[in-house]
Amino acid sequence: MNDLRMYNVLVRPLVTEKSTMQLEKGNQISFAVATWANKPQIKKAIETIYSVKVEAVQVSNAKGKTKRFGKLEGKRKDWKRAVVRLQEGQSIDLFDQGA
């Protein structure tokens, strides 16, 4: 997988109450990833971009919600969530506090 495609695998980090607790207790970080990405691609992208060792990757597909736009009914995009467990002693600083 080339470098440009690796950056397309990770869409954004997910910051929720649940993901914050997972980060504090279990050294796990949640990401929204591309729907076409599989576990080995996600693992390789995170290890390359953030220079950390990944212990495990869990993925789940989330269906897009049905929403109304006035009279029209539309649907949000389906997306994929990845929960990445890092090895002991590894960490990712997603938000640079020094700026």
Curated annotation (Swiss-Prot):
Domain of life: Bacteria
UniProt-recorded Gene Ontology molecular function terms: rRNA binding; structural constituent of ribosome
InterPro entries: Nucleotide-bd_a/b_plait_sf (IPR012677), Ribosomal_uL23-like (IPR013025), Ribosomal_uL23/eL15/eS24_sf (IPR012678), Ribosomal_uL23_CS (IPR001014)
The keyword Ribonucleoprotein is assigned to this record: yes
Database matches in SUPFAM superfamilies: Ribosomal proteins S24e, L23 and L15e
Residues in the signal sequence: none
Gene3D superfamilies: 3.30.70.330
Cystine connections: none
Keyword Isomerase: no
Similarity remark: Belongs to the universal ribosomal protein uL23 family.
Annotated PANTHER family: 60S RIBOSOMAL PROTEIN L23A (PTHR11620)
Protein name stated in the entry: Large ribosomal subunit protein uL23
Organism: Magnetococcus marinus (strain ATCC BAA-1437 / JCM 17883 / MC-1)
Species lineage: Bacteria, Pseudomonadati, Pseudomonadota, Alphaproteobacteria, Magnetococcales
